Amino acid sequence: VMTVVSAAMGQAFFTLSLGIGAIAIFGSYIDKSRRLTGEAISVAILDTLVALMAGLVIFPACFAFGVNPGSGPNLVFITLPNVFNEMPGSRIWGAMFFLFMSFAALSTIIAVFQNILSFAQDLWGWSLKKSIALNAVVITLLSLPCALGFNVWSFIQPLGVGTTIQDLEDFIVSNNILPLGSLVYLLFCVSRYGWGWDNFMKEANEGKGIKFPKWPKIYITYILPLIVLFIFVQGYIEKF
């Protein structure tokens, strides 16, 4: 049970872009007339509904054709195409699936890139064009090991037999950066050594909409950091 709960919460870190500042960047574009609590609830609900709909489609299809639904990237590029081949109109379903996968990948790239671009503009005063050009070169170079890990660098198995460079990068991001980044954000918002609870409440409740309640202060300050830390430790226990 704990493994499933930990995996689900880890997935939430990824899909909601927690711990890497993407939500903060998009939140900065919302004017002061709208409170952040209602916006955050709407995003979380919509994300959950999309995940449930995807699960209702993918899992029955995998079980019907006797394939493993937990095969990671192979599920997208090997397993599901084989499932589509067994369905009437396989070319249409396959084409639509990868088309929508491209849209999903593009939206993710935009979210992550916007965070990096805004960081470069605010910290170093770069123009948007300069920030895009330089970051595109750097990210392309950093992406090469992942791409080459499936062919000419396939002999590199950093996490054991059968693993790839992508598995290592996924472990670094999903099991380290996302939970630890979320923990830093959380402690910054509630700790007197950071922004502080009062400043957080003032900012969260500015404007119109759903107010952020005061009653979960103890939970957010003391219990929630322990939950995030547990997810981080659980990821290492399952991996090693």
Predicted feature locations:
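A generic transmembrane alpha-helix motif of multi-pass inner-membrane proteins
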Residues: 158, 162-187, 209-240
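Transmembrane alpha-helical segments in integral membrane proteins
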Residues: 17-32, 103-118, 182-200, 239
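Membrane-interface segments at loop-to-transmembrane junctions
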Residues: 38-46, 207-218
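Transmembrane helix-loop junctions in multi-pass membrane proteins
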Residues: 1-2, 31-34, 57-70, 88-92, ...
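Hydrophobic alpha-helical segments of multi-pass membrane transport proteins
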Residues: 106-111, 132-135, 139-150, 167-202
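Loop-to-transmembrane helix boundary motifs in multi-pass membrane proteins
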Residues: 46-52, 91-94, 103-106, 120-156, ...
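Alpha-helical transmembrane segments
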Residues: 112-126, 161, 165, 187-213
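Membrane-embedded translocation segments of transport machinery
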Residues: 1-106, 130-131, 138
